[in-house]
């Protein structure tokens, strides 16, 4: 992800592009982008109607003097970004599968509806399995 090239991103976007998935910081290196690199990506996004899904689960696992900047903090990106994060990586809670998402209110309302239907245990079949 580091050293992202705006021209390559711009060239990859087609009329069918709806979402940019931004796994940042990157695993396993902890590589991060500085604010200027994120701003360059945001400038390309502003030219389109696409949303950004920013996977920031490794945000506290960065090394060196630079710190993580949330993509939603970049001017004009808050209303176009869904940030997903969790506790398992930063707090050594592997296996707990605890996470969260934040984004534009109306979009999150729909995401929560889908989550309620799609996430959960099907107890009857699991209870019948030896």
Predicted regions span which residues?
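Short, surface-exposed helix-loop/turn micro-motifs enriched in polar/charged residues
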Residues: 1, 49, 118-122
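Conserved core segment of the aminotransferase class I/II
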Residues: 74, 78-130
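Active-site pre-lysine segment of PLP-dependent enzymes
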Residues: 2-16, 28-51, 58-93, 106
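Hydrophobic residues in well-ordered beta-strands that form the structural core
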Residues: 21, 52-54
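Residue-level marker of structural boundaries
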Residues: 18, 38, 116-120
């Amino acid at each position: 992800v580091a050293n992202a090239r705006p021209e390559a991103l711009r060239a990859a976007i087609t009329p069918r592009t709806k979402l940019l998935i931004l796994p940042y910081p990157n695993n396993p290196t902890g590589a991060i982008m500085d604010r200027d690199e994120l701003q360059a990506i945001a400038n390309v996004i502003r030219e389109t109607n696409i949303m950004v899904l920013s996977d920031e689960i490794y945000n506290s696992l960065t090394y060196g003097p630079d710190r993580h900047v949330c993509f939603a903090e970049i001017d004009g990106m808050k209303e176009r970004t869904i940030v997903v994060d969790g506790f398992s990586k930063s707090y050594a809670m592997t296996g707990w599968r605890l996470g969260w998402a934040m984004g534009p209110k109306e979009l999150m309302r729909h995401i929560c509806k889908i989550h309620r239907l799609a996430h959960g245990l099907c107890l009857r079949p699991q209870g019948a399995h030896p």
